[in-house]
Amino acid sequence: MTDHFDTLIRWQECHDEQQNALLTRPAISASVEISRTVEQILHAVKEYGDHTLREFSRRFDKTVIENIRISPEEIAAAENSLNNDIKQAMQQAMNNIRVFHEAQKPIKIEVETQPGVYCQQVTRPIDSVGLYIPGGSAPLLSTVLMLGTPAQIAGCHKVVLCSPPPIANEILYAATLCGITEIFQIGGAQAIAAMAFGTESVPKVDKIFGPGNAYVTEAKRQVSQRVDGATIDMPAGPSELLIIADAGANPVFVAADLLSQAEHGPDSQVILVTPDEALAKKVITEIEKQLTRLPRNQIAAKALAHSRIIVTTSLQQCVEISNRYGPEHLIIQTRQPEQLVEKITSAGSVFLGDWSPESAGDYASGTNHVLPTYGYTSTYSSLGLADFLKRMTIQQLTPQGLLNLSQTIETLAQAEQLTAHKNALTLRVAALNIAGQGVNMNNIFDANLLARENIRKLTPYMSARRLGGKGDVWLNANEYPLAPDFQCTEQTLNRYPDCQPASVIRRYAAYAGLQPEQVLACRGADESIELLIRVFCEPGQDVVLFCPPTYGMYSVSAETFGVEQKKITALENWQLDIEAIENNLDRVKLIYICSPNNPTGNAINPDSLRKILELTANRAIVTIDEAYIEFCPENSIASWLKNYPNLVILRTLSKAFALAGLRCGFTLASVDIITLLLKVIAPYPLSTPVADIAAQALTAENIAIMQKRVVEIRENRNDLQQALNKLAIVEKVFPSETNYILVKFYDAETVFKTLWHQGIILRDQRKQPGLEGCLRITIGSRKECERVVEAISALSTVNEQPKEIAN
């Protein structure tokens, strides 16, 4: 075992004490002198404010400052002084940091832990934060971006930045990019004191972020332990790096990465762990070559004096050493790094493969470079959006909810001998029983107790509008982007409409090639889905079958009526698994098949549909949902109705007819089935205005206009597929027969959230079986499609070799 970096250490030959010593970090404990000096600085700033800040700047920074705060004119001048290259680089880095941290926005949690007991978890931004940026010969502009960007995303009301004078123009411009205007030219422990306690010029903040020297680190520690101080981001220590490398690693890259961390300071520590001794020797040689060419080679050499090259018996042993050490930065330069990272339990930030240098994370990949060091990775995490937020829980109990919990709470309070806690319950329960108020604990109304159990447990269908969002490009509901021009002609709103408006039925029958008696008009195809279950399925006896991934209302409707479901997952190509369906037809009364299928966009093989119809003859109703059939009319099987009496077809005016807001759909079936559905349908499913506009839409002239729309959408679809297929972030663009496409992304979450915040709303399909990483994109106008491509292009680089799509 040695303290020299050019000597290999064979881990297996070291006993426990030696192994512990090898992984021991350089001591960083603040000296008594530093602690005492910092304590005096804190006291002086708290007592004398700005006067002390000016005096310390003169004494420590050799600078006389008139104005502690940087003026708007100075900030503007700083921006004008920089060349475009540095400004563009900073903008690109901030964009990536923003994308990654936007994706960290927490969701509101709402649960009913038991009937009448409602609990929430919400987040709020920390009201005021202070950012400390060290001075020196090289401006740490990247740290401004790493701290300022998440503070801005979190919505912190006040963001203060302090840095020693004179503040570099790059730091001022970086602060401007992050929306920071309160910038103060003070450094060292006195800056930490000013932000912790406040002065005449510098506002007091709630939490302080940022690195610094021993005095800054000690000042942060001391103010974090004072009631009148401020909390801090995390304990600080020297920078460190551990590399796990196999025989295939490039020794030039490994050496460069080790030196990039060693040059931070003489107390930095770098460690190479590898099972390949030949690689270790090549790295030593390469370090000697590269070290001589570094301007900071003396600093790096001092850091190397307490760094290590360790040879192990296996990559698994490398992982064990890394987890034991818990590095700030971990680089895994192996042939299959993804397999090893699953075993890593403690690291600040991990860099996978030969092409992921630690400097990428330092500046521009998007992850945060403010990381726990000195072994704190066992309990601390890399800086993120959550560090600028605070969690808050909310609970609300109904009277019945309180009664349901009262005995439990009283028993636990009694066990802890906290009588006042118990009384808080006992008095409320007594109040609910006071006869003078006419309240009886047995008669308190709680709607949840009356609701059917399956409804209490039901997860509602999340329609596009129910999911919310604030956008101007809505591509999540498969609607047409422009409203058609129709005017109401009927003036009989004082009268109830016909149950089945004759003109609508007659015209749709003609359009579909059927008799009017085979057509039922309803409030969208969704109503037909429910009507069929109500007519044909006995709860607790019959079964509804469908094949996910598919339209969610089949499941929700069955669950609403308490009807059992069988879900036969589609094949990999999203065609029907006929064998599995045939083996699961017991008690099945109703089958739903979407063709073209939502959300995958593919038409179902007609041979498969015919096979299902034959298997279920006289046993079950087979419902083919043709909501998107206008985009591929050759795939319609409406003409089969004359041969298959158990066939039902669902249609809508929402898609190609561009009338989603009308809520008008149709059921096509035999006369016998239509007659049964008429028994349970609401008396007036179509309002007079709906029937009026639907009849107009079904004229020959407007059908021709609809068909032109289809041609336009198909052209836009093909162009969008081709454009997306060229982007590196896109794993696959699936073929589609509809007005939407399904796209698989390498990072779907980032794409979805980034576009969401830009006002481009897509449909997230990642929770559907087999659709991991997939988003559904409605085909909008040409301009909307171009915006989608532009937004996703910003997250991706273009492949030189486009992927092939089949369509």
From Swiss-Prot:
Pathway annotation: Amino-acid biosynthesis; L-histidine biosynthesis; L-histidine from 5-phospho-alpha-D-ribose 1-diphosphate: step 7/9; Amino-acid biosynthesis; L-histidine biosynthesis; L-histidine from 5-phospho-alpha-D-ribose 1-diphosphate: step 9/9
Start and end residues of each stretch annotated as Histidinol dehydrogenase: 1-440
Cofactor note: Binds 1 zinc ion per subunit.
Gene Ontology terms describing biological process: L-histidine biosynthetic process
Binding site for Zn(2+): 261, 264, 362, 421
Region (Histidinol-phosphate aminotransferase): 441-807
Subunit structure: Homodimer.
NCBIfam families according to UniProt: hisC, hisD
Name of the molecule in the record: Putative histidine biosynthesis bifunctional protein HisCD
Native species: Photorhabdus laumondii subsp. laumondii (strain DSM 15139 / CIP 105565 / TT01) (Photorhabdus luminescens subsp. laumondii)
